[in-house]
A protein has these predicted regions:
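N-terminal Sec-pathway targeting helices
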Residues: 1-16
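Cell wall/extracellular polymer interaction/catalysis modules
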Residues: 21-158, 165-188
Length: 188
C-alpha cells in the first residue's frame, strides 16, 4: 500500500510541475506577436477592414498556452489573451492542431476570417456563437463547415475556435463594441 501511495505522490508531483510550466509558458507573449499584428494591420488596411483591432490565433503554440490575442493596432498592445481550442480531426492531439479546409475533416483551418454576427450554435441552440467567414483558399469552406467562435470545454472542437466561457463572453462583448469587419487571423 505504501508503495502505491509513493507512486501516486510522485505522479501527482510530476503533473503539478507540468501544470506550473504550462502556466508560465502560457503567460509568455509569442516572440513574433508584434510582427504578426503589424502584418494583420497591413492586411486589414489593404483590404478595407477594421484597422483599429484584430484577432490573432497562434496555433503554433500548444493548447495549454494562451494563443488567442485580441490586439489593439492603435495602441500596439494586447487587450485580451486566452486559451483556445482547435479541431480534433486529422493528426490533431490535445496539444497540437492539424489543418484542413475539407468538410467533415473536423480540423481547424488557417488563414484570415471576417468576424461576423453573433448567433447561436447550429447543433446547440442555447449556446452563443460568432460566425466567421474564411477569406483565403485555406479556409474558404468555413461557412459551409459551420466554423464558429464559441465557448467550449477542453482543447478540442469540431474545427471551431473555442474559448473558455468567461473569455468567450469578454471577446463577444469586445467585438460588439468595435466597428464591423474585424479580422481574425489563424496561423501556425
Amino acid at each position: 500500500m505504501k508503495k502505491y501511495l509513493k507512486i501516486i505522490a510522485t505522479v501527482s508531483a510530476v503533473l503539478a510541475g507540468i501544470v506550473a510550466i504550462a502556466f508560465v509558458l502560457s503567460n509568455l507573449k509569442p516572440v513574433d506577436l508584434q510582427d504578426r499584428a503589424a502584418q494583420l494591420a497591413a492586411y486589414c488596411a489593404a483590404h478595407g477592414y477594421n484597422t483599429d483591432s484584430g484577432i490573432l490565433v497562434d496555433y503554433g503554440r500548444f493548447s495549454l498556452q494562451r494563443r488567442l490575442f485580441v490586439y489593439d493596432f492603435n495602441q500596439d498592445k494586447i487587450v485580451l489573451k486566452s486559451l483556445s481550442g482547435h479541431g480534433k480531426g486529422g493528426d490533431s492531439t490535445i496539444l497540437t492542431a492539424d489543418f484542413s479546409n475539407e468538410h467533415g475533416s473536423y480540423c481547424s483551418s488557417i488563414g484570415h476570417y471576417r468576424v461576423g454576427r453573433h448567433r447561436n450554435m447550429y447543433n446547440r441552440p442555447f449556446v452563443p456563437a460568432i460566425e466567421v467567414n474564411g477569406l483565403d483558399k485555406t479556409n474558404s469552406n468555413a461557412m459551409k463547415r459551420g466554423i464558429l467562435i464559441h465557448p467550449g470545454v477542453g482543447p478540442l472542437s469540431l474545427g471551431c475556435v473555442t474559448l473558455p466561457v468567461f473569455r468567450y463572453m469578454q471577446v463577444s462583448e469586445l467585438l460588439e463594441s468595435l466597428p464591423h469587419n474585424v479580422i481574425m487571423w489563424i496561423y501556425e
